[in-house]
Amino acid sequence: MSRAPAVGMSIEHRRLREKLCRELAQSEHDAVVHTAREAARLRACPPAEKLRAIAAHAEYLRPRLDALLIPDQPFGIRIGRLVGEMFSGLRHLVADRVLSAERSYRATLLGLRHGIDVAWLLRDVTRREDNIRLFRFCDDLIAEREVLLREAERALVWFADHPSIAMASCAHTALGSGAATPSAALP
């Protein structure tokens, strides 16, 4: 596959990079917000602990991501995060209230996978632009986050061992009523 260094191509690469940067900022915002909310709903159980680890990782990377993205796109990155906050709010107020605990957990994992996919594509775009700092950031995010995501995916088995919690709606789980709460099911 050849890389033609045409002027039009570099403009298109820049536009694609800017779009992906906004999308990554939004996704990383979600990696903090959604994982923390989901972990709080699930309380003390293996899936919640895996989500807390992912939230901590996203928080840890955020200053580095901000240093790379905000100077080039201060407005665009803030808009990306604002959009992320709007979708997070909608998800919290509507979707998460009607989804079962395990389905909401899987939806969170799906969002995390999307973020890793964005990082992979952004990594390839930055490689073509010789943007080494952003390339390395994507490499680091991917290497660490994929491990954390695999661990969170393996924690799905916990729901098989706790079917009443798995089937409880998140609204029910979040209210902490009876044996449908993860902490009530633990010894």
PLM feature spans:
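Carboxylate-rich helix-loop segments that flank metal/cofactor sites and access channels
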Residues: 2-5, 67-107, 167-179
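Terminal targeting/low-complexity segments that flank the catalytic cores of oxidoreductases
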Residues: 1-13, 19, 179-187
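Conserved alpha-helical segments that form or flank metal/cofactor-binding pockets of metalloenzymes
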Residues: 45-84, 152-155
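Alpha-helical scaffold segments that form or flank carboxylate-/histidine-based iron centers
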Residues: 13-24, 43-64, 104-111, 133-145
